[in-house]
């Protein structure tokens, strides 16, 4: 299993409505893209300073599932939209143990 993270910092002209629309599109990945096992996205809560403005986390079975996700039309459309909004973006992938507590939990958004 692997966790894919995306952290974005917005350009000054990005509107809250644009962010809400983008977040909704990202959350639909779990329904639209079979390789996405779990996905979360949202704006920074501004609890600490020097954070990104927006983050996305998605779980995949393996690197090939991440590759299929990266090539999926729904992901490509969101990536194109994101590219118009960001001043900077950082991506990171790391391994999750198969017995990690995050795996196998019901998705509260779908429940």
Predicted features by range, described:
Residues 88-89:
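Interfacial aromatic-anchored transmembrane helix boundaries in multi-pass membrane proteins
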Residues 1-53, 61-71, 94-111:
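Short S/T/G/P-rich N-terminal loop/turn motif that feeds into the first structured element of a domain
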Residues 70, 79-82:
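Short, flexible helix/strand-to-coil boundary loops that buttress conserved ligand/catalytic motifs
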Residues 25, 81, 85:
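Residues that form generic nucleotide/phosphate-binding pockets
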């Amino acid at each position: 299993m692997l966790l894919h993270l995306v952290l974005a910092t917005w350009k000054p002209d990005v509107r809250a409505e644009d962010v809400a629309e983008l977040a909704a599109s990202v959350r639909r990945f779990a329904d639209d893209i079979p390789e996405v096992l779990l996905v979360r996205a949202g704006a920074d809560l501004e609890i600490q300073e020097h954070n990104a403005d927006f983050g996305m986390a998605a779980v995949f079975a393996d690197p090939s599932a991440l590759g299929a996700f990266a090539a999926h039309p729904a992901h490509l459309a969101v990536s194109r939209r994101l590219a118009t909004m960001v001043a900077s973006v950082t991506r990171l992938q790391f391994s999750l143990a198969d017995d990690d507590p995050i795996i196998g939990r019901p998705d509260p958004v779908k429940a």
